[in-house]
């Protein structure tokens, strides 16, 4: 039996792969408790973090609708979380016996909406709402929410596409954006979708999507509408059906925006049922006011451009059996919405059972051959790794059949492909031109494996104005090849940064000379009316005339750049120039005062820099160093530069996360602050590679601009030196470009850290690899 000092454990009520949940008694005062134990002898750091995070978060809330946390105890080499022994069973167990009557459902639903509203008021996103995480007292009908191990206190998060088996939350209940397949960040409204799934199940006895296949379930959340509750429960009041389906909207903007607005609608349903015995129709959402500035993650004024992109995809999808390659060039200045436009077609592409992959050129990594190509195809590998073993083996066979004994030439550029193919024999060295021809031929063969008529491939390459020469040459040769592939190639670039003689223009001219005519989509600034629409969605409770005046001012100052508009609105809100009057239920501002304080006189970079300078000095320092790494960075690279632990760095970066200047790319970051240095030292750190990215290139650029030239050279040199020291020789080839780029960016200082002969040899190794790749 499990042994925990001062606790008598009566029974194990749940056994998971990593956690046991028990009922017991605290012996010091005979208080009944529920105990969550980390069962492994040496728990993983991420599991320790989750348990500590849950304890610290729940114990700080003190909410009646949340199962209380009493204490955290040491248990072997891990931890035990001591919880309130509330209720008798979970809603899952309760639902297994019967679907609750309508009145009982409303009582449960109102309590859950109220508790969720309180959680969101405390900036907590639960992220794993489901019947088994709701405990009910069957005598009183009271319900409480439990299990906050993956809950977040960030305004927004980014979840990249990952194996459905490894997603945060429970797959049957997670929102479309929580699957990581929507190219949008996640916020508190993910909980409304999960609540909608629960309500649907409580009313009908069925989940909206009951498939057991993980990939199919992700597809359902993204692309399929559930059967109407009216079909499953013929007598359900239409207004209650509408409430549930509003919660289940695919886009967060179309759901409820405030849990108390949801609660008000549910209370009106209960009142009618109590007083009249039935629920009649009424307008839902009348009290759905968040009081927060919430800029929608959707496109404005780009409807025709989206249609044009989809038309290109359909031409590729239904093209000639011999294959069809179509190029779309999306142009426009930074922040104008090029990436957002292209990402709009990701769901339709997924619905068509096709692959959407994306890579992004990095201004600081322009010398790395095939960098955006590698990034995009590594994301494809990650998608393939989510498939079943049998399907993955089929892909392996197809790829090897296409590449033959030369697969290693592709693995040199796309190392993650080895996760599917395994170790491959080396390929013979060839002169540079022949090596390049071999690679391009093999790459065309690889593309043909995935780019079939029944599942075309959409390849999106962003920021082509920074693309390396090898990638540009590959694109030119690919489009004029005889590859029998169905590919939609979308390239986005800042046309105002591409002057005559730029390599990208040379590539496009070469493609045109072959008789190839790309589709061109110019993304232009928003009109003043569209800016007004954006602001109306962000602040719906506003005086229309006053909002028009403010919209005109922001349109004039930002020249209709949507990212600039959003940054300006956020800054005005943070500076309390925009305030919500809860008494009157309306947004208020003083236009004259806004013009006086000077915020609207800043250009985009200056505005971002001013916001960066409001952060604590230590946070600013970390962002400056991170900017020298690139648009993405990780704590393990930063830590030795500043001589701090990753845990300390994560704590210092939290203000930047809370301001949405950087975003975490893997969920372990959400629980990092709960760890202790002892946890870090004692636990297995197998899953502690914590990665961030700057929200936008302009934020990265602003942070980089804060670094003085002399300091910049020093940081680059030290980064390169530390990367060299920390990389085993047998793995140095994998990161040789990153090492050399950093050292060369701080070459004067690098020469004081590394022997000149060593520095020359590293550059020679990088050049040799570049030749092999190119």
Regions found by a protein language model. Name each.
Residues 286-293, 329-336, 341-347, 375, ...:
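Short secondary-structure boundary elements
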Residues 76-90:
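Conserved short submotifs of the Hanks-type protein kinase catalytic core
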Residues 108-109:
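Activation segment signature within eukaryotic-like protein kinase domains
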Residues 114-124:
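Protein kinase catalytic-loop region centered on the HRD/HxD motif
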Residues 42-60:
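AlphaC helix of the eukaryotic protein kinase fold
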Residues 172-275, 559:
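C-terminal lobe helix-coil module of Hanks-type protein kinase domains
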Residues 371-458, 506-517, 529-536, 544, ...:
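Conserved Walker-type P-loop NTP-binding/catalytic site
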């Amino acid at each position: 039996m499990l042994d925990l000092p001062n606790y008598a454990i009566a029974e194990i009520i749940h056994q998971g792969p990593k956690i046991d949940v028990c009922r017991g008694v605290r012996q010091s005062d005979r208080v009944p408790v529920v105990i969550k134990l980390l069962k492994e002898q040496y728990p993983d750091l991420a599991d320790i973090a989750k348990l500590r995070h849950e304890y610290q978060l729940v114990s700080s809330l003190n909410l009646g609708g949340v199962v209380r946390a009493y204490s955290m105890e040491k248990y072997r080499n891990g931890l035990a979380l001591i919880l309130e022994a509330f209720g008798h069973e979970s809603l899952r167990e309760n639902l297994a016996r019967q679907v609750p009557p309508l009145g009982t459902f409303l009582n449960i639903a109102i309590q859950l909406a109220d508790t969720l509203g309180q959680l969101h008021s405390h900036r907590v996103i639960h992220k794993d709402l489901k019947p088994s995480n709701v405990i009910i007292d069957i005598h009183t009908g009271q319900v409480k929410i439990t299990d906050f191990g993956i809950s977040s206190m960030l305004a927004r998060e980014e979840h990249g596409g990952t194996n459905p088996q490894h997603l945060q939350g429970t797959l049957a209940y997670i929102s479309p954006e929580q699957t990581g397949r929507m190219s949008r960040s996640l916020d508190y409204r993910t909980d409304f979708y999960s609540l909608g799934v629960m309500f649907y199940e409580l009313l009908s006895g069925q989940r909206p999507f009951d498939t057991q296949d993980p990939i199919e379930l992700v597809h359902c959340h993204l692309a399929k509408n559930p059967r109407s509750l009216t079909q499953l429960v013929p007598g359900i009041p239409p207004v209650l059906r509408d409430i549930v389906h509003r919660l289940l909207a695919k886009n967060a903007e179309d759901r409820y925006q405030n849990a108390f607005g949801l609660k008000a609608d549910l209370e009106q349903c209960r009142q009618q049922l109590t007083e009249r015995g039935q629920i009649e129709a009424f307008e839902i959402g009348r009290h759905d006011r968040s009081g927060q500035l919430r800029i929608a993650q959707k496109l404005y004024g780009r409807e025709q451009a989206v249609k044009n992109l989809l038309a290109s995809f359909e031409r590729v999808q239904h093209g000639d059996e011999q294959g069809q390659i179509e190029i779309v060039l999306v142009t426009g200045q930074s922040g104008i919405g090029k990436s957002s436009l292209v990402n709009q077609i990701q769901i339709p592409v997924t619905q068509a059972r096709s692959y959407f992959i994306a890579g992004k050129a990095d201004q600081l990594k322009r010398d790395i051959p095939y960098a955006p190509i590698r990034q995009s195809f590594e994301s494809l590998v990650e998608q393939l790794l989510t498939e079943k073993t049998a399907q993955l083996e089929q892909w392996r066979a197809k790829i090897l059949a296409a590449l033959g004994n030369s697969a290693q030439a592709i693995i040199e550029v796309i190392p993650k492909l080895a996760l599917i193919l395994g170790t491959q024999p080396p390929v013979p060295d060839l002169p540079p031109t022949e090596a390049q021809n071999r690679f391009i031929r093999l790459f065309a063969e690889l593309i043909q494996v995935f780019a079939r008529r029944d599942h075309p491939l959409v390849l999106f390459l962003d920021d082509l104005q920074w693309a390396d020469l090898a990638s540009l040459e590959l694109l030119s040769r690919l489009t004029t090849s005889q590859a029998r592939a169905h590919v939609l190639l979308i390239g986005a670039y800042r046309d105002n940064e591409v002057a005559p003689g730029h390599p990208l223009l040379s590539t496009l001219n070469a493609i045109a000379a072959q008789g190839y005519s790309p589709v061109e989509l110019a993304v232009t600034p928003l009109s003043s009316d569209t800016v007004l629409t954006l602001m109306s969605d962000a602040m719906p409770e506003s005086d229309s005339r006053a909002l028009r005046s403010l919209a005109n001012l922001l349109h004039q100052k930002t020249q209709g750049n949507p990212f600039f508009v959003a940054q300006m609105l956020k800054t005005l809100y943070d500076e309390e120039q925009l305030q919500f009057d809860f008494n009157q239920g309306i947004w208020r501002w003083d236009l004259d005062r806004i013009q006086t304080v000077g915020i609207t006189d800043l250009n985009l970079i200056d505005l971002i820099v001013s916001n960066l300078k409001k952060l604590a000095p230590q946070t600013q320092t970390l962002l400056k160093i991170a900017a020298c790494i690139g648009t993405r960075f990780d704590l393990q690279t930063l830590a030795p530069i500043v001589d701090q632990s990753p845990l300390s760095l994560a704590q210092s970066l939290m203000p930047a996360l809370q301001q949405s200047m950087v975003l975490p790319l893997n969920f372990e970051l959400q629980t990092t602050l709960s760890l202790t240095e002892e946890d870090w030292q004692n636990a297995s750190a197998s899953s502690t590679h914590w990665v961030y990215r700057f929200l936008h290139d302009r934020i990265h650029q602003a942070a980089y601009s804060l670094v003085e030239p002399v300091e910049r050279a020093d940081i680059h040199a030290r980064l390169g030196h530390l990367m060299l020291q920390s990389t085993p020789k047998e793995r140095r080839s994998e990161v040789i470009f990153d090492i050399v780029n950093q050292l060369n960016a701080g070459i004067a200082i690098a020469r004081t850290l590394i022997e000149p002969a060593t520095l020359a040899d590293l550059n020679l190794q990088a050049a040799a690899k570049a030749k092999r790749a190119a």
